[in-house]
Design a protein with these regions (language model features):
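A binding-site-centric feature that preferentially detects glycan-recognition modules on secreted/surface proteins
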Residues: 2-128, 132-196
């Protein structure tokens, strides 16, 4: 009986406290209302209802917020009704920089290892790294990564050869670049997306 009691009082580490939940919803609502051009025709009350019905998604959004991503709604999937959140910080999220691309890249470094990898951090946060297509779509909503850059999901055929892709905006246009996946920079992080 006592073991059952202890189990029931344990909280899932992916649960937010009521205060965290309230603060996050307030920040998300404020950002949503200030940036209506990112999600024309969408209604915050419907977004909030979805969020409240999916507490594990709130935890992931809180991780996006905590690491500097400033997540916001950028669309809605017409088939599933899911709202699509993306990191909309002006520069790549500051809490996600100095990461190599993935675990294989991290393991390949003999010395001067970075603190982690973008792919693993995204998975731990419960989000997906942006694809090249998603990154270009985001750039239609504003000017992002004008001073920094963001790793993007890299096709397996490029990754197999040791490379990884990143994107940024310079000189008024968006670029896709490549580096060895084991490289890391203080000015490069990654942007994520989450469907709710």
């Amino acid at each position: 009986m006592e073991g059952t009691k202890n189990m029931s009082t344990k909280t899932n580490k992916r649960d937010l406290s009521p205060k965290q939940r309230e603060d996050l919803l307030k920040a998300l609502k404020s950002r949503f209302e200030k940036n209506m051009s990112r999600h024309k025709g969408l209604d915050w009350t419907k977004v909030q209802a979805r969020l409240e019905a999916n507490p594990e998604k709130l935890w992931s959004l809180n991780e996006m917020e905590r690491t500097g991503g400033e997540p916001d709604v950028v669309g809605q999937d017409k088939k599933t009704g899911e709202f699509i959140f993306v990191d909309c910080s002006e520069q790549t999220p500051s809490g996600r920089v100095s990461l190599c691309y993935d675990r294989a890249a991290l393991d390949s470094r003999k010395e001067h290892k970075p603190k982690g990898s973008a792919v693993e951090m995204a998975a731990a946060m419960g989000i997906e790294m942006l694809t090249e297509e998603q990154y270009f779509e985001l750039q239609k909503l504003g000017e992002f990564d004008t001073k920094r850059s963001s790793w993007i999901a890299t096709p397996p055929e490029i990754r197999k050869l040791g490379g990884a892709l990143y994107c940024d905006r310079r000189y008024g246009r968006v670029f896709v670049g490549h580096n060895g996946a084991e490289s890391y920079y203080s000015g490069r992080g990654f942007r994520g997306s989450l469907r709710v």
